[in-house]
């Protein structure tokens, strides 16, 4: 089956939107030393320069998906791009660290509109038999942006100036907005209430959990602040589930999780991005602190992993129809675990870079096969009326997985090593990669629960519940 012109436009525009959002999750990492000098920022301020984006992005994803369903997916995608670009300009113009942190939080809010709506528009544009292929392209661009962020950030900060890592978003967004409004078809969504109680409970629960995960690395898991926010997040999360089970118009129809493919795909996606973010976070530092490369040099040496994501993720989308999603998810994550354990075993100061390439390629290849398969498993059996909420759920869990991956790997790292010397860093790096491998194996087990065929029907009862009147936006 051929892809028509409209579908190609949808694929291109939604992939660029995903690239913009995903790139900014990592792009500041290699520019932080320069930002610290130019803005006289403290270490805590640098931490929040990264975390403000992750925090607002993670907790507002479900809200973004719900707004798209109520107000129109295409329209709200354009609004999200505009907000993202305005915040990017504010980041570039920030006179101090506080202003930069505030602008990053707003940038995350724009991203929370862009990513779930991009995926829902893409999924709606393709028939079920072509969705796996389209999602493979989309996921490859997303993964490429995550891996390429440190390279681009280091190159721009070193060659031009740090504000340009944010200025780059502005012209892209100005071109994107009219193209989105002109080239993406008017979407169909649910004319339903926004479920404000669900929005408050979901946002509050996610905020508490993400805040605790981020703060625990700095002040300890036993601190009153972490325990309070973690407990509050869990309670609000439980209250959210209870509310959604009885709400007349739920933001997240809980019966979607009766689908094994949807439940397992979301679990695997959570673990996948925990692995990916943990790997990128520590590998970039290992190349600099442990092996002595500069920021740009470290980013460039991540290119083997970047290449696997660019090449294999689209291929995985095509393979799904022949080998099944279950094999791609479980096999890919098992391969990633092998590569991560390999890295942990060979890590040492003075390690020749060429010895690091094979395990990096193995891990990157495994992740590249699993990313589109997990996303496909979560979305392929979803009724059309629930595409927006399903994509918001998947992306929220994926983002929280990234935060969790960095937090758990950092906790393991701090237990065994530190930043006092290259040797101390390497001592902690090995166990951190071991923790990443453990997360990969958890995701591989979840992948075994995906039905062993190309697609799975929605769970009984889901279609009966999800028959709201669809209306064009």
State where each predicted segment sits.
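Loop-to-transmembrane-helix transition segments
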Residues: 193-202, 266-272
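Transmembrane-helix bundle of Major Facilitator Superfamily
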Residues: 1-182, 314-316, 323, 327-329, ...
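Helix-loop junctions on the cytosolic side of multi-pass membrane transporters
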Residues: 177-198, 219, 242-251, 448-458
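Phenylalanine-glycine-rich, low-complexity intrinsically disordered regions
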Residues: 184-189, 203-226, 241-245
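Intrinsic disorder in cytosolic terminal tails and internal cytosolic loops
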Residues: 1-6, 450-473
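12-transmembrane solute porter fold
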Residues: 7-30, 39, 43, 49, ...
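Interfacial helix-loop-helix linkers and transmembrane-helix boundary segments
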Residues: 68-69, 73-75, 131-133, 188-194, ...
């Amino acid at each position: 089956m051929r892809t028509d012109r409209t579908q190609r436009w949808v694929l291109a525009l939604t992939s660029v939107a995903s690239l913009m959002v995903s790139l900014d999750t990592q792009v500041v990492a290699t520019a932080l030393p320069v930002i610290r000098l130019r803005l006289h920022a403290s270490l805590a301020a640098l931490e929040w320069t990264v975390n403000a984006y992750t925090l607002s992005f993670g907790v507002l994803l479900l809200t973004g998906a719900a707004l798209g369903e109520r107000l129109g997916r295409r329209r709200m995608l354009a609004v999200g791009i505009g907000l993202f670009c305005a915040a990017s300009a504010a980041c570039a113009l920030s006179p101090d660290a506080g202003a930069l942190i505030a602008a990053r939080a707003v940038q995350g809010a724009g991203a929370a509109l862009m990513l779930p709506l991009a995926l829902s528009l893409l999924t709606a544009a393709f028939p079920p038999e072509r969705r796996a292929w389209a999602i493979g392209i989309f996921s490859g661009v997303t993964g490429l942006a995550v891996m390429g962020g440190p390279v681009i950030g280091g190159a721009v900060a070193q060659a031009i100036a740090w504000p340009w890592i944010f200025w780059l978003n502005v012209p892209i967004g100005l071109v994107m907005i009219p193209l989105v409004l002109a080239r993406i078809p008017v979407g169909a969504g649910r004319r339903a209430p926004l479920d404000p109680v669900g929005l408050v409970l979901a946002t509050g629960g996610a905020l508490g959990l993400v805040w605790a995960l981020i703060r625990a690395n700095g002040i300890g898991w036993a601190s009153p602040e972490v325990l309070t926010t973690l407990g509050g997040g869990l309670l609000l999360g439980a209250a959210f589930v209870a509310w959604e089970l009885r709400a007349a118009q739920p933001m997240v129809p809980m019966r979607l999780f009766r689908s094994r493919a949807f439940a397992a795909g979301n679990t695997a996606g959570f673990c996948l991005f925990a692995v990916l973010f943990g790997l990128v976070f520590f590998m970039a530092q290992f190349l600099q602190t442990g092996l002595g490369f500069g920021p740009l040099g470290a980013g460039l040496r991540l290119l083997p992993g970047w290449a696997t994501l660019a090449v294999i993720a689209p291929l995985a989308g095509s393979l799904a129809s022949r080998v099944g999603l279950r094999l791609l998810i479980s096999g890919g994550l098992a391969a990633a675990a092998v590569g991560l354990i390999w890295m942990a075993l060979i890590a040492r100061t003075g390690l020749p870079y060429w010895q690091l390439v094979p395990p990096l390629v193995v891990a990157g290849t495994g992740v590249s096969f699993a990313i589109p398969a997990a996303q496909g498993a979560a979305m392929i059996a979803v009724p059309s009326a629930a595409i927006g909420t399903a994509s918001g759920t998947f992306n929220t869990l994926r983002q929280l997985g990234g935060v969790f991956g960095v937090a758990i790997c950092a906790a393991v790292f701090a237990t065994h090593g530190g930043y006092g010397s290259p040797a101390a860093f390497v001592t902690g790096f090995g166990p951190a990669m071991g923790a990443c491998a453990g997360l990969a194996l958890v995701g591989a087990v979840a992948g075994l629960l995906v039905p062993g065929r190309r697609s799975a029907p929605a769970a009984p009862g889901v279609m009966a519940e999800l028959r709201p009147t669809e209306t064009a936006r």
